[in-house]
Amino acid sequence: TPEMLGTLFEELITGRHEQGAYYTPAYVVSYMSKESIKRYLGANGILLSKDLIGTIDASNPYTGDAQQILELLKNVKIIDPACGSGAYLVGFVNEIMRLYCTLSPDADSHSIFAFKKHCVSKCIFGVDLEEYAVQIAQLRLWLSLISQAVDPMPLPHIDLNIVVGDSISGPNPGKHYLWPADQKSAL
């Protein structure tokens, strides 16, 4: 599973604390994903009670404009500037998909896969210093996507969204991190 791959990577990497590499526990990833979505929706006019995001499910359906939330989720952009093995990125996709499936109870497997593919290829971005960590993050997102594939179909170019770089201190901390021109145009 994508989670197992991340755990394995986190356990095998040596010297991570010397490099400032720390990995986020699953319960923190879940909380951060829900909070991020709640704040994003709130900034776009959808005010939800404190715990509503976490409690929207089949037994507690959302009674507002589900289509408006789905459209916002389709257009969200999330970046993890120190993504490591991609725990937050995968957690965010999982939370978006949990909400999508709850708000679209009649969605068929093709629609679910198409929405997830869109999220992975258009909404999720990450940067990390370690090439191996970036490769694991990409693989985790691909595995997450493949796990719901109904027909063999081309996978998105996640390698354009998850890149090796230093987005925190970079060569010049006064400048914003810029995606390479060839990758930026592909997005």
Language-model segments: which ranges?
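Long recognition/docking surfaces used for binding and targeting
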Residues: 1-12
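SAM-dependent methyltransferase catalytic region
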Residues: 14, 18-187
